[in-house]
A protein has these predicted regions:
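Active-site entrance/lid segments in N-terminal catalytic domains of soluble metabolic enzymes
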Residues: 1-178
Length: 179
């Protein structure tokens, strides 16, 4: 991937550990980040907004302590996956918490990322968008995302049906940013 400038020097490997439903949580994410890989989890893994608030507070404290203990260490940023589909009643409260805790990056899925981009960019965070087709990538790019995640055939979760090589090639025809 083309590494965003905000991530340079903070990662040992230019990779994002996937936000795995019911698997990824604050402990896994913190340890992943301490190993120099960007860790993520789905917002909905925290079963309530109160739990999400606690998780984000814990993550920020754990990673700040790791950076303070070894300033030379590559402690990667963490991110959160926010499902934007209309069936998710927690989009607004979760986005509020994301902004409160200034989550370094947000991965949007299953919806238009425009409002998330505005909110997250307001505090200096980055927004990446999951896409399964070049059509969706164009919409995400137009919304101002900082990166596009090509979810191709064989990916976990809400996978697309297109081959990764052809999907990336199609997106690269118009997108020069982080992919």
């Amino acid at each position: 991937m083309t590494v965003p400038s905000a991530f340079r020097g903070a990662m040992r490997l230019p990779a994002i550990a996937a936000p795995m439903f019911l698997v990824s949580g604050p402990t896994l994410v913190a340890e992943t980040c301490k190993a120099g890989v960007a860790g993520t989890f789905p917002a909905l893994n925290a079963r309530t907004p109160d739990e999400l608030d606690a998780w984000l507070g814990t993550l920020n404290a754990d990673l700040a302590a790791a950076r303070a203990a070894d300033p030379a260490a590559a402690v990667a940023p963490y991110g959160i996956n926010l499902i934007l589909h209309a069936s998710n009643p927690r989009v607004a409260p979760d986005l509020e918490l994301i902004c409160k805790h200034k989550v370094p990056f947000v991965i949007t899925s299953l919806g238009q990322p425009g409002e998330v981009v505005k909110a997250v960019h307001a505090y200096g965070g980055l927004v990446f968008s999951d896409v399964i087709h070049a059509y969706h990538a164009r919409k995400a790019a137009a919304a101002g995302v900082d990166g596009i995640i090509a979810v191709a055939s064989g990916a976990g979760g809400h996978a697309g049906t297109q081959n990764a090589f052809s999907l990336v090639r199609e997106i690269r025809e118009f997108w020069n940013g982080t992919l």
